[in-house]
Structure formats: C-alpha cells, structure tokens
C-alpha cells in the first residue's frame, strides 16, 4: 500500500507542476462548445445530486419530470441504494440514485462519487479488484432485467464516473462521466460493448493528469469523446460536481426547458463562459 500511495502522490505532484494552458490533462481533448452543453447538463446535475450534500447546490430536476425511486420503485428522497449496515459500508461504499422519467421510458442510474478526504485516494486511484465496481455492474444488470422496457443510461462524478464507464463497457449502455476516476474495469476478457461513452471534465481538475496516462483509461476512452470545460470557479476546487453541473446548465440556452429551469437554480455560482 505504501508503494501505491507513493505512486499516487508522485502523480499528483506532477499534476501540480503543470501550470501552462497546454498542460491541463488530456492532450487531445476537445473544448466543449456552448451549444453542446445541453446534451450533458441533465446527467451532470444527476451526478451532483447523488452526493445529497446540503452545503452544495441541489438541482430540483423533479420539476423536469424525473422521480428518484428506490430498488422497489417507490419514490424516495434519499439515495436509491446505500449499504444497509456499517459492516457492508466497510467493504463497499457504493451508493447510487435511480431516476425514472414520468412521461417516457428513460431511466438514469447515477453513481455517487466520493469526496471524503480519508478514502478519496483509495476510491479513485487504488490498484486491484474493487467490490463497488462489481456491485455497480450487478445492480445495473438486475435493473435492466427487471425493467426490459426501459432505456437505461448511467452517469456519475469522480468515482461514480468510473463506475458508470465500467458498467457501460460490460452492459452496452450509454455512459456520461464527469471528472471521472481513471479506474475502469472491463474484466479479464476486455469487455468493450458498443455504446456511447463521453467524459466531461473541468480544466486542471485533479484527476485529469492521471487519466491522461492511466493505461486502461486510455485504452477504453478515445480522446475524441473527452471534452474539457473552462468555467470560472472563483477559487473553489475544480473537482466540484455541482459547479461543473451548474456551468453546463447555464450554457444550455439552446434548450428552452433547461434555459427556464436554470433561472430557478439560485444563487448563481457559475456562469457559462463557453463559446
């Protein structure tokens, strides 16, 4: 473990030395165009909402026709799934939301990331098998089998983004990941089922430099599907899920529903800034 932590610290130091605009992570990533933001804003808001952190912006997407349900399909205000006991949480910190749209057959499963200081490195950069990744895939598969009529998409931020990408590789479902962990597991047989997989990250976000040379991440993600944003966070951590989501929402002026919804999200912490 000490050697692994040394590697991680070295990588983060390397990231800290990257101060020029060209050294922002993924060398060939595209800057996200303003008129593309509306494609990803909803997923980013769901990824952010999974934290249920009262100190951060909550996006009331219920007003857009979405309902968070538990594993039995009942409306819930908490995460759809969390470990049932403290013993279970020791082996897996998996938490996720199931969002079902009331007027369509669309479902979005949003995996919670982690921003606890103690387990942040372990969750995002640890090397080796991971119980949360296996459990995430199992739960998505079970939902699809139980609801074959629904169109399922996965999303997540940080560790949650890694869980979403891994589930997509195994189960052939579209995935949208925000500031994701570089850890992506596709199994011994290198499962790479065809699906749309997109990564959106804020420039100089702490994991971007690591993802840019993490072997498995580079193998499964083409840089043509990786997009960088340059929102102004005014000194707040560039890894924040709610700031990235708000920036994308503020830029969604080509979608009337999202444009109107953005006016309800206050106070304004992030402006658009994309071109």
Region locations from a protein language model:
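Short glycine-enriched nucleophile-adjacent loop
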Residues: 165-169
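A conserved cap/lid and substrate-binding interface adjacent to the catalytic center
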Residues: 19-29, 38, 42, 51-154, ...
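Bacterial N-terminal signal peptides that target proteins for export
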Residues: 1-6
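Hydrophobic membrane-insertion alpha-helices, especially the h-region
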Residues: 9-11
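C-terminal motif of bacterial Sec signal peptides marking the signal peptidase cleavage site
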Residues: 13-16
């Amino acid at each position: 473990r000490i050697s692994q932590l040394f590697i991680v610290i070295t990588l983060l130091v390397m990231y800290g030395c990257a101060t020029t605009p060209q050294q922002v992570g993924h060398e060939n990533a595209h800057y996200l165009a303003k008129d593309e933001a509306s494609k990803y804003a909803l997923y980013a808001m769901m990824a952010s909402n999974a934290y249920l952190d009262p100190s951060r912006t909550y996006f009331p997407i219920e007003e857009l026709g979405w309902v968070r349900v538990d594993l039995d399909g009942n409306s819930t205000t908490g995460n759809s799934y969390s470990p049932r006991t403290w013993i279970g949480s020791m082996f897996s910190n998996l938490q996720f939301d199931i969002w079902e749209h009331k007027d369509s057959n669309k479902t979005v499963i949003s995996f919670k990331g982690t921003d606890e200081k103690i387990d942040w490195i372990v969750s995002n950069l640890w090397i080796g098998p991971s119980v949360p990744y296996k459990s995430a895939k199992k739960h998505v598969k079970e939902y699809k089998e139980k609801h074959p009529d629904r169109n399922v998409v996965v999303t997540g931020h940080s560790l949650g983004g890694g869980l979403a990408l891994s589930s997509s590789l195994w189960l052939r479902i579209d995935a949208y990941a925000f500031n994701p962990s570089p850890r992506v597991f596709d199994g011994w047989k290198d499962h790479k089922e065809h699906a749309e997989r997109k990564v959106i990250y804020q420039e100089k976000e702490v994991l971007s430099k690591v993802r840019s040379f993490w072997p498995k991440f580079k193998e499964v993600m083409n840089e043509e599907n990786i997009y960088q944003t340059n929102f102004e966070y005014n000194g707040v951590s560039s890894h924040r899920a709610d700031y990235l989501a708000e920036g994308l929402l503020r830029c969604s002026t080509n979608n009337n529903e999202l444009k109107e919804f953005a006016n309800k999200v206050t106070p304004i912490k992030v402006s658009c800034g994309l071109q």
